[in-house]
Amino acid sequence: MSPLIVGTLIIILLSGLATAFYVTWQGRLICAGVGLILEQAYEGGQMFNTLMAHCFETYNGVEKSGTQCVADWLKVGLLAVTFGAGGPRLVNTLGGTFLTSPTAKRSNLYCDDFTGADYFSCELETLRPYTLMRKSLPYGNIHDVWINTTDTHQMIGVHMTLNGTDMIHYYNKTYVINYSGLKLNSSAINKRSYFYPQDSFLVSHAEWQDGNGIWTDTDYFAAMADCDFLGQNLGFWLASSYPNAYKWETQLWRTVGINLNGNIIYPGQLIMQTFNGS
């Protein structure tokens, strides 16, 4: 077979694959590309920024036309886990903590005070039960992430230190960890905090007021990229410990973990399998 024919066949094959990716699901090819370059993204930064720039064009939670690909593979829910009448089940595995409940209409947010003491809870409302995993991170201002392993493997919460204060952020509320309990941060610190965009990235936006009454803002966020690639269910947990990361500056991202067909893999080793119990 001549080199010309071989080259033509290769071009046709590659074109067909590219077309199939695009037609099957907008954003899937981008998602696969993000997965393949993830480890290099926070070193070089530029390729990841280029892939995402035309896809993520949202500000303050308002998605612009043509950015539905973001919603297809970046999902964020609430930091919440439901409890049945018998209370929560706590399952420890090789490096992860699962909180599970089969049924409940009223729920608690079940949180560690991060001092090794007993767990405690604060009341929340949720619509459905979750299997929740907490994984500690070894760097920066983001210390722990929570992942919904029940079905979608979404990143659903983050524990971080912001302005010297340990906090758990989820949706519209901020809880301050004061090492003796968990309280809603309503008056201890003069600040405003919220998440945006709620359907794409988990963004903790905090606005701080100084002694002169001037407000400044800081953003930290975590994200979840989830997609199918060549029949493999891949999920990539990303987190940034830098402020204002939504600007897509370089060297912001770290790979938190990879979900490969139900196996949650962290850099260098297999930590645990997804817990699917009730």
Swiss-Prot record:
Residue positions bearing lipid (GPI-anchor amidated glycine): 96
Superkingdom of source: Eukaryota
Signal peptide (residue range): 1-20
UniProt keyword annotations, A-Z: Cell membrane, Glycoprotein, GPI-anchor, Lipoprotein, Membrane, Signal
One cellular component (GO) term of this entry: external side of plasma membrane
Pro-peptide region(s): 97-278
Subcellular location: Cell membrane
Disulfide bonds: none
Nuclease found in the keyword field: no
Record flagged with keyword Zinc: no
Topology within the bilayer: Lipid-anchor; GPI-anchor
Protein name, per record: Uncharacterized GPI-anchored protein C212.08c
